[in-house]
């Protein structure tokens, strides 16, 4: 795809990355076959190819509108399109760049900003989300029967083996997983324990940063990433063999740390180390 990026982004790190990605796209449309929003809505602009055109226009100097933002908002960032792209277009990174530019050019209404801020505050805070989840489950008897059936029932995580092996790995707790699916990490710990490996959760870890990254708060996301890189690298230096990811979304985000921190002289190399040692 031929590009002619505008001056405001041409010589920036994001501009160079975007241009490289855009030039790979050959307009074939294979991506639309695996895009859930395109399959549901049937609108070219709600598929990867259409969104790539929208992003290209904005990066070439066309002013973004609320409609542009809406089409990018509808993208789930599932990156399923990347699995069928013969040109290996890195759509996930491109849509992040596009969203950040569009967010600046087409500011959201106050209510939307408030709602997204509340989502970031709630979902990325494990203790706050856990408390709200417990309160919510207590209200189940007050709900209509059909809604009550949708309420997630509390689960017992089961036994988590005590650390007793020389070999050990660490695992990301996640933000909502300890409340909604607490059995997963405990089950992973039991499986690894039978293989002679102890699994541990570093206490200081925080959200992987996906919530902020995908709701256009990149600075907050990078702060979380740096904190986790510090924790992961310390654990690796102390003998941990790997960083285990039991949530695919968190795993995908951590695998992107090296790309997102590529321009940070203090964290670029350490983020690559975390990437090489991450197991999803």
Predicted regions and their residues:
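Iron-sulfur cluster-binding electron-transfer modules in prokaryotic oxidoreductases
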Residues: 14-15, 91-280
């Amino acid at each position: 795809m031929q590009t002619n990026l505008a001056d405001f982004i041409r010589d920036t790190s994001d501009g160079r990355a975007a241009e490289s990605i855009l030039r790979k796209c050959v307009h074939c449309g294979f991506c639309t076959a695996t895009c859930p929003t395109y399959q549901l809505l049937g609108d070219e602009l709600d598929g990867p190819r259409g969104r790539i055109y929208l992003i290209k226009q904005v990066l070439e100097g066309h002013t973004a509108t609320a409609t542009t933002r809406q089409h990018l908002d509808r993208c789930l960032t599932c990156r399923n399109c990347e699995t069928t792209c013969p040109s290996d277009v890195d759509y996930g990174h491109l849509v992040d760049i596009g969203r950040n530019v569009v967010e600046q050019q087409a500011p959201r209404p106050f209510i939307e900003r408030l709602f997204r801020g509340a989502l970031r505050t709630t979902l990325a805070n494990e203790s706050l989300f856990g408390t709200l989840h417990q309160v919510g489950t207590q209200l189940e008897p007050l709900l209509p029967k059909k809604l009550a059936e949708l309420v997630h029932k509390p689960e017992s995580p089961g036994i988590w083996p005590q650390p007793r092996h020389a070999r050990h790995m660490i695992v990301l707790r996640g933000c909502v997983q300890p409340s909604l699916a607490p059995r997963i990490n405990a089950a992973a710990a039991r499986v690894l324990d039978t293989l002679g490996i102890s699994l541990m959760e570093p206490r200081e870890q925080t959200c992987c940063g996906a919530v902020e990254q995908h709701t256009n708060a990149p600075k907050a996301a990078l702060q979380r990433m740096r904190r986790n890189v510090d924790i992961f690298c310390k654990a690796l230096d102390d003998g941990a063999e790997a960083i285990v990811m039991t949530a695919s979304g968190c795993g995908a985000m951590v695998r992107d740390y090296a790309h997102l921190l590529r321009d940070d002289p203090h964290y670029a190399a350490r983020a690559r180390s975390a990437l090489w040692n991450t197991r999803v």
